[in-house]
């Protein structure tokens, strides 16, 4: 038979115990942002490594860190713009709890965390694509069908990749709000 991925949603998880619940983000005009691609930050490539380097970030006198995409993407060597699962942290960087710990530590040190999110498209492994796709070969891969409430059958522009979100759709608007 054909092997396919399955999407699993974890429910009933223990909530993270945030140490800082009243962080106030800097005003936009006051932002001093340091952009981080975790994959290239250093050889460790993990959230834990960012946690361990908080003094480095503080010494830069920044007040915000922008994380290039950290959501689950296809493959392991990527900038993350080939997102497959928006609701999952990529396995390459470590567990979700470590990301939350990093955010909390940044907030304890007056540093905001900004996520670079990819909401223009999604790659073929996404269950949002697979639920409404044309699969002419029956191999689990295909393009969005006209029944898809989320995607354009054909991208409405020439500069995209993956499956193009239909941002006019109320489903997409709800999903991306």
Where on the chain are the PLM-derived regions?
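Alpha-glucan (starch/glycogen) binding determinants
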Residues: 1-11
């Amino acid at each position: 038979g054909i092997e396919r991925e399955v999407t699993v949603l974890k429910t009933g998880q223990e909530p993270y115990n945030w140490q800082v619940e009243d962080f106030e983000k800097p005003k936009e005009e006051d932002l001093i942002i340091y952009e981080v691609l975790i994959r290239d930050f250093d050889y460790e490539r993990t959230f834990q490594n960012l946690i361990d380097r908080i003094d480095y970030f503080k010494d830069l006198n920044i007040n915000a860190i922008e994380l290039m995409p950290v959501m689950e993407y296809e493959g392991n060597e990527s900038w993350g713009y080939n997102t497959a699962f928006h609701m999952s942290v990529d396995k390459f960087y470590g567990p979700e709890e470590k990301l939350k710990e990093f955010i909390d530590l940044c907030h304890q040190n007056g540093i905001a965390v900004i996520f670079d999110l990819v909401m223009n498209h999604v790659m073929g492994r996404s269950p949002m694509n697979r639920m409404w796709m044309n699969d002419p070969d029956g191999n689990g891969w295909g393009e969005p069908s006209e029944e898809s409430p989320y995607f354009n059958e054909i991208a409405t522009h020439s500069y995209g990749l993956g499956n193009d979100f239909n941002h006019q759709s109320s489903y997409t608007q709800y999903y991306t709000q």
